[in-house]
Design a protein with these regions (language model features):
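Nucleotide/phosphate-binding catalytic cleft detector across ATP-hydrolyzing
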Residues: 1-14, 18-176
Length: 176
């Protein structure tokens, strides 16, 4: 069975849904699209949950009808004034691979990204994305992919995206 992917754009004026199926050769074939007037939103924020849910349902049902199958999950975005971002840096000692070398492993990369996320944020906000910008190994800057390199100290410069917790929760409730 082909993998189905669904995108949902909840805009202030229109809600749009698109359903695609990956073909055997890896291409994405659009099988359904739907749109509905957007109700219950202002400036990207949900102000009337039931009205917004109805708009989402209408757009998804139109796409499902065209595609001929039911949607089980969607990809969507959150935007507007409830989203903000900041830069951060994380630093860890390289644990190595357990074989006597200090080769940087995937686990080391995960640890340094976790360290970079350890920044104070308002309790009303949640980190939704951490985007690695560049890595530094033992003072050598500008490394895009540290995996497999040898070093003792690993640093990561990241861009952290946060959103208002209530906006995230309302968006999830709107889609469910």
């Amino acid at each position: 069975m082909s993998e189905t992917i669904v995108g949902l754009d909840i805009g202030t004026s229109t809600v749009r849904a698109v359903i695609g199926v990956f073909t055997e050769n890896g291409e994405l074939q659009i099988t359904g699209v739907g749109k509905a007037p957007s109700n219950g939103l202002r400036n990207g924020a949900i102000i009337n949950l039931e009205a917004a849910m109805s708009s989402v349902t209408d757009a998804i049902e139109a796409a499902e009808m065209m595609a001929g199958h039911e949607v089980l999950s969607v990809y969507t975005a959150i935007g507007g004034s409830q989203v903000s971002s900041m830069n951060s840096t994380g630093v860890v000692g390289v644990a190595g691979n357990g074989k006597g070398t200090q080769e940087i492993s995937q686990r080391d990369i995960e640890r340094v990204l976790e360290a970079a996320k350890s920044v104070p944020i308002d309790m009303a906000r949640q980190i939704i994305h951490v985007i690695p910008q560049t890595y530094t190994i033992d003072g050598q800057k500008g490394i895009k992919s540290p995996l497999g390199n040898v070093g003792v100290r690993l640093e990561a410069e990241v861009h952290i995206v946060t959103a208002a917790v209530t906006s995230i929760q309302n968006l999830i409730r709107c889609i469910k």
